[in-house]
């Protein structure tokens, strides 16, 4: 814990500390996405043990990543939702679906001539969320251990679902804004607005 006066306190763990490999977060990766299985709610807690010759863990020392704004879909073609702006972020989705339904959400920066998701430019980055419903009815998913670079999101499921609410949480580096710009030229203003979305890189630049 770092305090405002520059001092700090270390709160260490002891033999009473326990951990678990269970829980709904089954997989998470910076480039490939996250798997959340809400059926996995039971946690088996086990005593921890110290591993030899491991690297020292330190807290992140750069600018924090924070929510900048939320985008709603501006269009939908097939099962592809268009958020109108290429950005770094993660979806928050509420669905009405049966228990055990597997929902797959792929993210991309482009669509093809038929309006379907185009992901060849992402190379090996999968940018995919796999969400498994833990009960019947309304449930919300909000991945917290990955982020995507995208404008379009393709949603599919192995059972019929209803998307109740869908929005994209735009993520950005927590940099202090020191000025603003506006003008009557639409193209120039759009260029300026796009700059605000460049504080976190998108998949091709990662």
Which residue stretches match the model-derived regions?
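Extracellular/oxidizing-compartment recognition motifs
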Residues: 1-206
């Amino acid at each position: 814990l770092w305090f405002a006066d520059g001092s700090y306190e270390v709160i260490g763990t002891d033999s009473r500390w326990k951990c678990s490999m269970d829980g709904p977060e089954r997989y998470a990766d910076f480039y490939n996405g996250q798997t959340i299985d809400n059926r996995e709610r039971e946690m088996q807690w086990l005593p921890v043990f110290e591993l030899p010759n491991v690297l020292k863990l330190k807290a992140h020392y750069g600018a924090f990543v924070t929510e900048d704004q939320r985008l709603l879909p501006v269009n939908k073609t097939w099962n592809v939702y268009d958020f109108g702006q290429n950005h770094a972020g993660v979806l928050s989705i509420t669905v009405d679906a049966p228990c055990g339904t597997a929902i797959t959400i792929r993210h991309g920066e482009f669509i093809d001539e038929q309006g379907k998701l185009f992901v060849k430019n992402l190379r090996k980055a999968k940018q995919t969320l796999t969400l498994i419903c833990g009960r019947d009815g309304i449930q919300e998913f909000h991945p917290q251990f990955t982020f995507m670079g995208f404008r379009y999101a393709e949603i599919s499921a192995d059972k019929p679902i209803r998307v109740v609410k869908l929005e994209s949480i735009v993520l950005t580096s927590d940099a202090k804004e020191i000025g603003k710009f506006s003008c009557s030229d639409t193209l120039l203003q759009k260029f300026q607005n796009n700059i605000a979305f460049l504080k976190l890189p998108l998949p091709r630049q990662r």
